[in-house]
Amino acid sequence: MLNLVRLFAVVDDIFCLFQGHIENVALLKQQYGLNKTANEVIIVIEAYRTLRDRGPYPADQVVRDIQGKFAFILYDSSSKNAFLASVSNKNVLYSS
């Protein structure tokens, strides 16, 4: 049985609880300009923040480039948006 990591982080009033594993961590770190110590939860926050700051994108855009087995819930307290994704059933829920 695969042991899935559970991580929590807060960056600039964006809260994220992540469980699982991302397979393409190195590629995503490069894509988002993150340092070598960035983990899965930081990658999710940065993907969300990058897309949020670029304009209105569909919520599922955040998870399109992420490969692996994971689920996360993200809350952006500045915009009061919540975002839940689960790769196991390909669902992305977004609440604003």
Residue ranges and their predicted role:
Residues 1-96:
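N-terminus-centric sequence/structural signature that marks the extreme N-terminus
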